[in-house]
């Protein structure tokens, strides 16, 4: 490292990249709630084709990390659930 590098301003590319990452994170967070609602309804529709399920017994959890989002879905299916004809 040179003594001249201590007083040099950082280049604009890393700053722009960081700003873009923050902007994308905000956009993904805003779209996430809509996506979760859509996924919930579609997953319920698919499961309901095969087994009778109470919609109130479905729990959805979304965990977001820096690089990954995890969607966890718990569907409570009774042991005596009636299989539906497809």
Curated annotation (Swiss-Prot):
Function field: Prevents the cell division inhibition by proteins MinC and MinD at internal division sites while permitting inhibition at polar sites. This ensures cell division at the proper site by restricting the formation of a division septum at the midpoint of the long axis of the cell.
InterPro entries for this protein: MinE, MinE_sf
Annotated GO biological process: cell division; regulation of division septum assembly
Family: Belongs to the MinE family.
Sorted UniProt keywords: Cell cycle, Cell division
Gene3D superfamilies: Cell division topological specificity factor MinE
Database matches in NCBIfam families: minE, PRK00296.1
Stated name of the protein: Cell division topological specificity factor
The encoding gene: minE
């Amino acid at each position: 490292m040179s003594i001249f590098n201590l007083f040099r301003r950082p280049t604009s590319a890393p700053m722009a990249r960081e700003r873009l990452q923050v902007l994308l994170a905000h956009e993904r967070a805003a779209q996430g709630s809509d996506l979760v609602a859509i996924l919930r309804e579609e997953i319920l529709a698919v499961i309901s084709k095969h087994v009778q399920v109470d919609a109130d017994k479905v729990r959805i959890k979304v965990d977001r990390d820096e690089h990954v989002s995890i969607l966890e879905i718990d569907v409570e299916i009774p042991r005596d659930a009636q299989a539906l004809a497809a």
